[in-house]
């Protein structure tokens, strides 16, 4: 069960949905678009990059259906492309470029906090799927 709420005052899109746990308790997860944007900017991904908006859209879709993390190429990129009037190849490339810029010029402390890794500079940026999964689970675990 999910629904979008668009508040009139600040025009923030808020996604609210319910997850049924094994014990049949209902947990409500609230992910705000502004929270996603703020986290990406803290990492160091510039908001003016096309990949930035694709990552935001991708994380919104993953919040609706975490199974997207198992179908990045043939599911997530295709659906992001549809929502953004683009192609799956452009979505993949722009997300990859935004991640690379973020890891090249971004805030290492923030990157280490989310990715639990101290030397991405040696390894380069994570793959798109690893990045999206790590950011998604960070947001879920920290209720952002």
Placement of each model-derived feature along the sequence:
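A generic alpha-helix structural signal
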Residues: 2-5, 59, 95, 136
């Amino acid at each position: 069960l999910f629904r979008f709420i668009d508040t009139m005052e600040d025009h923030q899109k808020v996604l609210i949905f319910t997850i049924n746990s094994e014990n049949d308790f209902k947990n409500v997860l609230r992910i705000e678009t502004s929270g996603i944007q703020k986290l990406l900017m803290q990492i160091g991904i510039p908001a003016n990059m096309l990949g930035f908006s694709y990552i935001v859209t991708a994380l919104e879709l993953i919040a609706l259906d975490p199974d997207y993390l198992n179908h990045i190429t043939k599911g997530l990129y295709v659906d992001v492309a549809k929502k953004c009037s683009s192609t799956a190849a452009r979505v993949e490339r722009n997300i990859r470029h935004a991640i690379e810029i973020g890891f090249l010029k971004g805030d290492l402390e923030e990157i280490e906090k989310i990715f639990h890794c101290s030397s991405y500079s040696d390894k380069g940026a994570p793959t798109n799927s690893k990045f999206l999964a790590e950011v998604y689970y960070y947001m879920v675990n920290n209720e952002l």
